[in-house]
Amino acid sequence: MTLLALGINHKTAPVSLRERVTFSPDTLDQALDSLLAQPMVQGGVVLSTCNRTELYLSVEEQDNLQEALIRWLCDYHNLNEDDLRNSLYWHQDNDAVSHLMRVASGLDSLVLGEPQILGQVKKAFADSQKGHLNASALERMFQKSFSVAKRVRTETDIGASAVSVAFAACTLARQIFESLSTVTVLLVGAGETIELVARHLREHKVQKMIIANRTRERAQALADEVGAEVISLSDIDARLQDADIIISSTASPLPIIGKGMVERALKSRRNQPMLLVDIAVPRDVEPEVGKLANAYLYSVDDLQSIISHNLAQRQAAAVEAETIVEQEASEFMAWLRAQGASETIREYRSQSEQIRDELTTKALSALQQGGDAQAILQDLAWKLTNRLIHAPTKSLQQAARDGDDERLNILRDSLGLE
């Protein structure tokens, strides 16, 4: 059994590729079923966010394993293998464990130390438990990563400053508009990222917020908290002209805001500028919008320059966190190796007990037939000894014949011989 982590993220692939490799919530179960149908896959977890798509797998080793999994991923998303191969990373066993721990701790995020990723990893794990996990080692790896993430956040200052994609989006808005108190902001979506954006905006005295979402109930709860108006996604076209700032983050597989929609809004606004911040993957705003005069479109990748200014104080904490991850990953792999030994021990004990029961049954039968008790017991002891030492004796003899002193010493040590 081998543990694997493979995928792409914001460091290896542009948003144009990442949006083609995402797994939407609506198709996740189907994807997991398809993944587990692969003969080499024992269990799997799919993590798909705006910045990464990753598969965490427990697999049986086989020839061309990497090729088979890349082919599955490309076939599922109708991708050319060459388009994906150069952006794909592949981690195995200890490296896979370390990678997951780093991801869960925010050490591999676009925003170093951001806390939202832990919730996303936990959700991915929970989704996989609906009949798709099927591997105790994989489950233990995820549970361990959660405790490591908690330890990193508790024992280091990795989360000391309020830095996130949501924070960066608000920072961008404050850089472009002198005061946010007089602008109208349209938020598209009502997920965790938009919740954070809404709270940041409220802290910066935004008076007018509109939340557009597919389900009104979720949006209404957030609107009640931040004092916003709620509209449906179908109302965006009519209300876009009211917004000075649009920040969008949904799980829609297709763009929600098109070039024509923005053109109409700009005309109604008499070309008063609009800021559009698209932090969704796949993108919510058609890229062509960025070519329009007075429409200033930023994607999640464009936020990197803003985010980089807020990282300095987290670098020292990241070094401490990496040490914790290295230690915890090493301990996990030691536990995993011990599980392999435990199975061997169980098999050896079962084999020995089977020999014991077989010979004891024969001895009891002989006693019941009136045989000499002392002779029967001596015969039992002799046969039991010979049967139990038969396999170790053959291994010792073979090691001696091969001149394999290292193996001979290991066998002597295993048998308790000085």
Curated annotation (Swiss-Prot):
<dbReference type="Pfam" id="PF00745">
    <property type="entry name" value="GlutR_dimer"/>
</dbReference>
<dbReference type="GO" id="GO:0008883">
    <property type="term" value="F:glutamyl-tRNA reductase activity"/>
</dbReference>
<feature type="binding site">
    <location>
        <begin position="49"/>
        <end position="52"/>
    </location>
    <ligand>
        <name>substrate</name>
    </ligand>
</feature>
<comment type="similarity">
    <text>Belongs to the glutamyl-tRNA reductase family.</text>
</comment>
<feature type="binding site">
    <location>
        <begin position="189"/>
        <end position="194"/>
    </location>
    <ligand>
        <name>NADP(+)</name>
    </ligand>
</feature>
<dbReference type="InterPro" id="IPR015895">
    <property type="entry name" value="4pyrrol_synth_GluRdtase_N"/>
</dbReference>
<protein>
    <recommendedName>
        <fullName>Glutamyl-tRNA reductase</fullName>
        <ecNumber>1.2.1.70</ecNumber>
    </recommendedName>
</protein>
<feature type="site" description="Important for activity">
    <location>
        <position position="99"/>
    </location>
</feature>
<dbReference type="InterPro" id="IPR015896">
    <property type="entry name" value="4pyrrol_synth_GluRdtase_dimer"/>
</dbReference>
<dbReference type="GO" id="GO:0019353">
    <property type="term" value="P:protoporphyrinogen IX biosynthetic process from glutamate"/>
</dbReference>
<dbReference type="InterPro" id="IPR036453">
    <property type="entry name" value="GluRdtase_dimer_dom_sf"/>
</dbReference>
<dbReference type="InterPro" id="IPR000343">
    <property type="entry name" value="4pyrrol_synth_GluRdtase"/>
</dbReference>
<keyword id="KW-0560">Oxidoreductase</keyword>
<dbReference type="InterPro" id="IPR006151">
    <property type="entry name" value="Shikm_DH/Glu-tRNA_Rdtase"/>
</dbReference>
<dbReference type="InterPro" id="IPR036343">
    <property type="entry name" value="GluRdtase_N_sf"/>
</dbReference>
<dbReference type="Pfam" id="PF05201">
    <property type="entry name" value="GlutR_N"/>
</dbReference>
<dbReference type="InterPro" id="IPR036291">
    <property type="entry name" value="NAD(P)-bd_dom_sf"/>
</dbReference>
<comment type="pathway">
    <text>Porphyrin-containing compound metabolism; protoporphyrin-IX biosynthesis; 5-aminolevulinate from L-glutamyl-tRNA(Glu): step 1/2.</text>
</comment>
<comment type="function">
    <text>Catalyzes the NADPH-dependent reduction of glutamyl-tRNA(Glu) to glutamate 1-semialdehyde (GSA).</text>
</comment>
<dbReference type="InterPro" id="IPR018214">
    <property type="entry name" value="GluRdtase_CS"/>
</dbReference>
<dbReference type="GO" id="GO:0050661">
    <property type="term" value="F:NADP binding"/>
</dbReference>
<feature type="active site" description="Nucleophile">
    <location>
        <position position="50"/>
    </location>
</feature>
<comment type="subunit">
    <text>Homodimer.</text>
</comment>
<dbReference type="Pfam" id="PF01488">
    <property type="entry name" value="Shikimate_DH"/>
</dbReference>
<feature type="binding site">
    <location>
        <position position="120"/>
    </location>
    <ligand>
        <name>substrate</name>
    </ligand>
</feature>
<feature type="binding site">
    <location>
        <position position="109"/>
    </location>
    <ligand>
        <name>substrate</name>
    </ligand>
</feature>
<feature type="binding site">
    <location>
        <begin position="114"/>
        <end position="116"/>
    </location>
    <ligand>
        <name>substrate</name>
    </ligand>
</feature>
<keyword id="KW-0627">Porphyrin biosynthesis</keyword>
<keyword id="KW-0521">NADP</keyword>
